A protein has these predicted regions:
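Phosphate-group recognition and catalysis centered on beta-loop-alpha active-site segments
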Residues: 1-212
C-alpha cells in the first residue's frame, strides 16, 4: 500500500499492479512470484492461504488483496497478470468494487486475455508485447484491445502509427531514463509506464522557463 500512496502523491495518472492467487483462491497484489525478496520466505503466494499471508509483514508492509486496493484507491489501475489462474477472481473483485471503467487489464499471455474477454465483453484490455515482430492486427482486434503495451525499445514510430491506424492506443514500459522518455514520446505513444514518476512528470510538463 505505501507504494501506491507514494505514486498517487507524486501525481501518477494510473498505478500498475501485479496479481497472485492464494491457495484458497483469493486474488492478492504482489510483484514478486515468491515472498523471498521482501520477507525471506521461500514460498509462492499459491503455497499459502490468505490467513497465512495475513500473518506476514507488519504495519502497512503487507500483501493486500486486490479488493482492498480497489476500495482504498480511486486512481485508475493497470492490472497485470501472468496467467489465467487469476482472471476470474480479478474480474469478480473489479466488478464488486464497481471499478470496471478504471481498470485496464494487461498481460502478455494471450490465452489469459482471451479467457478474460470471454467472461467480460466490457473489460478494458491491453496486450503486453516483448517480441521483435509487430503485433498481428488480427490478434489486437480479436481481443478488442484498447492498448498495445510493448517494451519501450519496441515502440518505434512506425509500429505506433500502425497500431494507431487500428484505433488502438499505445502504452510502453518501463521507461526510467530521460533519453528513453524523449524517444518514446517522439514515437507518439499515448502512455508511459515508469518507476520515476516525478522525473516523468517534469519531462512531460517542463516549467515555462524551460520551454522558451
Amino acid at each position: 500500500m505505501p507504494a501506491f500512496e507514494a505514486a498517487v502523491h507524486l501525481g501518477a495518472d494510473m498505478v500498475e499492479l501485479d496479481l497472485r492467487r492464494t491457495r484458497d483462491g483469493v486474488i492478492v497484489v504482489l510483484h514478486d512470484p515468491t515472498l523471498l525478496r521482501l520477507w525471506g520466505i521461500d514460498r509462492t503466494v499459491g503455497d499459502l492461504d490468505l490467513a497465512q499471508i495475513r500473518e506476514i509483514g507488519e504495519g502497512d508492509v503487507r500483501v493486500p488483496t486486490l479488493r482492498e486496493v480497489l476500495d482504498q484507491f480511486t486512481i485508475p489501475l493497470m492490472v497485470d497478470f501472468t496467467g489465467d489462474e487469476v482472471v476470474e477472481g480479478a474480474l469478480d473483485a473489479v466488478r464488486e468494487a464497481d471499478a470496471t471503467d478504471r481498470s485496464l487489464f494487461v498481460s502478455g499471455h494471450v490465452g489469459a486475455l482471451r479467457a478474460l474477454r470471454a467472461l467480460s465483453p466490457e473489460a478494458r484490455i491491453g496486450l503486453t508485447w516483448i517480441e521483435r515482430r509487430s503485433p498481428p492486427p488480427s490478434l489486437l482486434c480479436e481481443l478488442g484491445a484498447e492498448f498495445w503495451n510493448p517494451y519501450f525499445r519496441l515502440a518505434t514510430s512506425a509500429r505506433v502509427a500502425a497500431v494507431h491506424d487500428l484505433g488502438i492506443k499505445v502504452s510502453t514500459w518501463t521507461v526510467d531514463e530521460p533519453r528513453h522518455m524523449a524517444r518514446v514520446a517522439k514515437a507518439g505513444v499515448d502512455a508511459i509506464v515508469s518507476n520515476r514518476i516525478a522525473q516523468l512528470r517534469r519531462f512531460l510538463s517542463p516549467p515555462e522557463s524551460a520551454r522558451r
